[in-house]
């Protein structure tokens, strides 16, 4: 009677629903979601994790080239070996061409042949630098090593350009006329064809590996190919028009200026980058 009367009494106060249910503990619902150390991640931990992920990315100036994002490890090593093979072939072939061109320049008084001989010597040196650049398998993507190689190439370019310019200007000042024969033609054609083929191979590998050093080596081979054909052109022109004796020396000056400009630009671009990546020598 008491319960029914109290339930029907409109003046009675509200019934107490009891204590409110507490929010479930995530750790009790899913034990796997709790870290092993019992510590839940907070904002500081999330920030540290993001920072670590950024540090691990190859494009944050951490001393890696763009090729580290494009190539898989086995692909990078495959292209590295190809670059080494091309460099060895370039060293052997251009050394033979340099000796032949020096012989032609001495025997036939050709300024452009001398320029090509020096450029072939430069090609040998640049290929040796590329060999050093890719000698370490772990440093295939090392930007710091890449920039050092480019700076050395820039210095060699400038020194070679000065020598070529001095020789060409001297020949023009003394009105030295080149002598034309079959030996000169043979060296010119072989040099032009071989250097052009090497240039294409180096440019392709340099593009894949994003290597400025390989591209620079390819540019040097391109200059060698142009100079090889220029020897042929200037000799043929002089054979039919002796009054155009200055063409040979003029081409030598032009090539010297091109090499000089490229060397200066290389130093201007790469010296600041060496300073930026000097703390990232972990692959050396």
UniProtKB/Swiss-Prot annotation:
Per the UniProt topology annotation, the Cytoplasmic ranges are: 1-83, 133-145, 204-212, 265-284
Q: Where is this region: Disordered?
A: 1-44
Q: Which UniProt keywords apply?
A: Cell membrane, Cytoplasmic vesicle, Endosome, Lysosome, Membrane, Synapse, Transmembrane, Transmembrane helix, Transport, Zinc
Q: What is its main location?
A: membrane
Residues assigned to the Extracellular compartment are 105-111, 167-182, 234-243
Q: Which GO terms describe its biological process?
A: myelination; oligodendrocyte development
GO CC annotation terms, alphabetical:
early endosome membrane; late endosome membrane; lysosomal membrane; plasma membrane; synaptic vesicle membrane
Note the topology in the membrane. Answer: Multi-pass membrane protein
Q: GO MF annotations for this entry?
A: monoatomic cation transmembrane transporter activity; zinc ion binding
Instruction: From the record, give the transmembrane residue ranges.
Output: 84-104, 112-132, 146-166, 183-203, 213-233, 244-264
The organism's place on the tree of life at top rank: Eukaryota
Query: Where is it located?
Result: Cytoplasmic vesicle, Secretory vesicle, Synaptic vesicle membrane; Early endosome membrane; Late endosome membrane; Lysosome membrane
Sum up the protein's function in the record's words: Zinc ion transporter that mediates zinc efflux and plays a crucial role in intracellular zinc homeostasis. Binds the divalent cations Zn(2+), Ni(2+), and to a minor extent Cu(2+). Is a functional modulator of P2X purinoceptors, including P2RX1, P2RX3, P2RX4 and P2RX7. Plays a role in central nervous system development and is required for myelination, and survival and proliferation of oligodendrocytes.
Descriptive protein name: Transmembrane protein 163b
From which organism does this entry originate?
A: Danio rerio (Zebrafish)
Q: What's the encoding gene here?
A: tmem163b
């Amino acid at each position: 009677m008491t319960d029914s009367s109290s339930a029907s009494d409109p003046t009675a106060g509200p019934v107490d629903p009891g204590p409110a249910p507490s929010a479930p503990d995530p750790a009790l619902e899913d034990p796997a979601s709790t870290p092993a150390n019992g510590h839940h991640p907070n904002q500081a931990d999330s920030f540290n994790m993001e920072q670590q992920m950024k540090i691990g990315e190859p494009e944050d100036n951490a001393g890696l080239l763009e090729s580290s994002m494009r190539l898989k490890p086995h692909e990078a090593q495959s292209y590295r070996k190809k670059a080494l093979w091309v460099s060895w072939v370039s060293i052997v072939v251009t050394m033979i061409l340099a000796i032949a061109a020096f012989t032609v320049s001495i025997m036939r008084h050709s300024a452009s042949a001398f320029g090509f001989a020096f450029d072939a010597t430069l090609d040998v040196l640049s290929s040796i630098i590329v060999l050093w650049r890719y000698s370490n398998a772990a440093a295939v993507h090392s930007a710091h090593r890449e920039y050092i190689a480019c700076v050395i190439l820039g210095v060699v370019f400038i020194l070679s350009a000065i020598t070529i310019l001095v020789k060409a200007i001297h020949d023009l000042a003394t009105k030295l006329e080149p002598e034309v024969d079959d030996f000169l033609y043979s060296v010119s054609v072989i040099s032009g064809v071989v250097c052009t083929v090497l240039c294409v191979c180096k440019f392709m590998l340099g593009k894949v590996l994003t290597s400025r050093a390989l591209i620079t080596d390819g540019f040097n081979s391109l200059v060698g190919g142009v100079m090889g054909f220029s020897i042929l052109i200037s000799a043929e022109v002089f054979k039919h028009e002796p009054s155009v004796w200055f063409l040979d020396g003029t081409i030598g000056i032009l090539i010297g200026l091109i090499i000089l400009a490229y060397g200066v630009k290389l130093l201007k671009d790469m010296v600041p980058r060496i300073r930026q990546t000097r703390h990232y020598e972990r692959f050396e």
